A protein has these predicted regions:
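Short, charged/polar surface micro-motifs in flexible loops or helix N-caps
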Residues: 47-51, 58, 78-81
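Short beta-strand micro-motifs in enzyme catalytic cores
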Residues: 40-42, 69, 104-106
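Core segments of cupin and vicinal oxygen chelate
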Residues: 12-51
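Vicinal oxygen chelate
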Residues: 1-2, 85-123
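Short, conserved charged micro-motifs
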Residues: 18-20, 78-83
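Short glycine-enriched loop/turn motifs at secondary-structure junctions
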Residues: 3-5, 64-68, 99-100
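N-terminal beta-strand motif that seeds the catalytic metal site of vicinal oxygen chelate
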Residues: 1-18, 71-73
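Acetyl-CoA-dependent GNAT
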Residues: 54-58, 120-123
Protein backbone atom coordinates (compact mmCIF):
# COMPACT_ATOMS: atom_id res chain seq x y z
CA UNK A 1 0.00 0.00 0.00
CA UNK A 2 1.29 3.45 -0.91
CA UNK A 3 -0.33 6.52 0.61
CA UNK A 4 0.51 10.06 -0.43
CA UNK A 5 -0.89 12.48 2.13
CA UNK A 6 -3.79 13.26 4.43
CA UNK A 7 -6.81 13.99 2.22
CA UNK A 8 -9.18 15.49 4.76
CA UNK A 9 -9.95 15.84 8.45
CA UNK A 10 -13.60 15.57 9.52
CA UNK A 11 -14.78 17.76 12.39
CA UNK A 12 -18.09 17.81 14.26
CA UNK A 13 -19.12 21.43 14.84
CA UNK A 14 -21.85 23.08 16.90
CA UNK A 15 -22.50 25.36 13.90
CA UNK A 16 -20.77 24.22 10.69
CA UNK A 17 -21.70 27.49 8.96
CA UNK A 18 -20.11 29.64 11.70
CA UNK A 19 -17.08 27.35 11.82
CA UNK A 20 -16.74 27.59 8.04
CA UNK A 21 -16.86 31.39 8.17
CA UNK A 22 -14.14 31.41 10.85
CA UNK A 23 -11.78 29.08 8.93
CA UNK A 24 -12.31 31.08 5.73
CA UNK A 25 -11.87 34.55 7.25
CA UNK A 26 -9.24 33.71 9.87
CA UNK A 27 -7.06 31.06 8.22
CA UNK A 28 -7.75 31.56 4.52
CA UNK A 29 -9.46 28.25 3.75
CA UNK A 30 -11.59 28.09 0.59
CA UNK A 31 -15.19 26.81 0.62
CA UNK A 32 -15.37 24.08 -2.06
CA UNK A 33 -17.93 21.54 -3.36
CA UNK A 34 -20.72 23.95 -2.42
CA UNK A 35 -23.28 22.27 -4.68
CA UNK A 36 -22.64 18.71 -3.43
CA UNK A 37 -24.34 16.49 -0.85
CA UNK A 38 -27.00 19.09 0.07
CA UNK A 39 -24.27 21.02 1.85
CA UNK A 40 -23.43 18.27 4.37
CA UNK A 41 -20.61 18.13 5.07
CA UNK A 42 -19.26 21.57 4.34
CA UNK A 43 -15.89 21.10 2.62
CA UNK A 44 -13.04 23.57 2.97
CA UNK A 45 -9.66 23.42 1.26
CA UNK A 46 -6.24 24.77 2.15
CA UNK A 47 -3.64 23.76 -0.42
CA UNK A 48 -4.19 20.06 -1.02
CA UNK A 49 -5.81 19.29 2.35
CA UNK A 50 -9.53 19.41 3.07
CA UNK A 51 -11.65 19.90 6.19
CA UNK A 52 -15.10 18.32 6.29
CA UNK A 53 -17.42 20.11 8.74
CA UNK A 54 -20.33 18.04 10.05
CA UNK A 55 -23.14 19.17 12.35
CA UNK A 56 -22.86 17.77 15.85
CA UNK A 57 -20.86 18.15 19.02
CA UNK A 58 -17.24 17.60 19.90
CA UNK A 59 -18.28 14.27 21.45
CA UNK A 60 -20.23 13.06 18.41
CA UNK A 61 -17.70 10.40 17.43
CA UNK A 62 -17.45 7.22 19.43
CA UNK A 63 -14.03 6.63 20.88
CA UNK A 64 -12.31 4.05 23.04
CA UNK A 65 -9.80 6.31 24.70
CA UNK A 66 -8.64 7.94 21.49
CA UNK A 67 -9.73 11.24 20.12
CA UNK A 68 -8.81 14.34 18.21
CA UNK A 69 -5.71 16.08 19.53
CA UNK A 70 -5.10 18.98 17.16
CA UNK A 71 -4.80 20.04 13.54
CA UNK A 72 -1.41 21.41 12.49
CA UNK A 73 -1.00 23.79 9.55
CA UNK A 74 2.46 24.53 8.17
CA UNK A 75 3.41 28.14 7.42
CA UNK A 76 5.10 28.63 4.05
CA UNK A 77 8.05 30.49 5.63
CA UNK A 78 9.18 32.04 8.90
CA UNK A 79 7.90 35.47 7.84
CA UNK A 80 4.51 33.83 7.18
CA UNK A 81 4.68 32.23 10.64
CA UNK A 82 5.31 35.67 12.16
CA UNK A 83 2.51 37.13 10.05
CA UNK A 84 0.13 34.46 11.38
CA UNK A 85 0.89 35.57 14.94
CA UNK A 86 0.21 39.21 14.06
CA UNK A 87 -3.05 38.26 12.31
CA UNK A 88 -4.28 36.23 15.29
CA UNK A 89 -3.40 39.07 17.69
CA UNK A 90 -5.27 41.54 15.46
CA UNK A 91 -8.34 39.28 15.60
CA UNK A 92 -8.11 38.97 19.39
CA UNK A 93 -7.28 35.26 19.25
CA UNK A 94 -4.90 34.22 22.01
CA UNK A 95 -2.21 31.67 21.26
CA UNK A 96 0.73 29.97 22.91
CA UNK A 97 4.21 29.83 21.33
CA UNK A 98 6.39 26.73 21.66
CA UNK A 99 9.98 26.17 20.53
CA UNK A 100 10.31 22.49 19.59
CA UNK A 101 14.01 22.87 18.64
CA UNK A 102 13.38 21.58 15.11
CA UNK A 103 10.32 23.77 14.63
CA UNK A 104 8.40 26.67 16.14
CA UNK A 105 4.66 26.45 16.72
CA UNK A 106 1.75 28.49 17.96
CA UNK A 107 -1.35 26.85 19.42
CA UNK A 108 -4.85 28.31 19.58
CA UNK A 109 -8.48 27.19 19.41
CA UNK A 110 -11.23 27.44 16.81
CA UNK A 111 -14.83 28.47 17.67
CA UNK A 112 -15.68 24.86 18.65
CA UNK A 113 -12.70 24.64 21.01
CA UNK A 114 -10.59 22.41 18.75
CA UNK A 115 -6.88 23.00 19.16
CA UNK A 116 -5.05 24.27 16.08
CA UNK A 117 -1.34 24.65 15.46
CA UNK A 118 0.57 26.73 12.97
CA UNK A 119 4.14 25.50 12.65
CA UNK A 120 7.30 26.24 10.73
CA UNK A 121 10.52 24.32 10.24
CA UNK A 122 12.02 27.40 8.60
CA UNK A 123 14.11 28.53 11.55
Amino acid sequence: MRLEQIDHVALHCASPEETMAWYVSTLGFEHVFQDKWSGVPIFLRLGSTFLALFPGTKDAGSSKGGGFSHLALRAASYPDFQSAQTELQTRGISFEFQDHEVSHSIYFRDPDGLQLEITTYDL
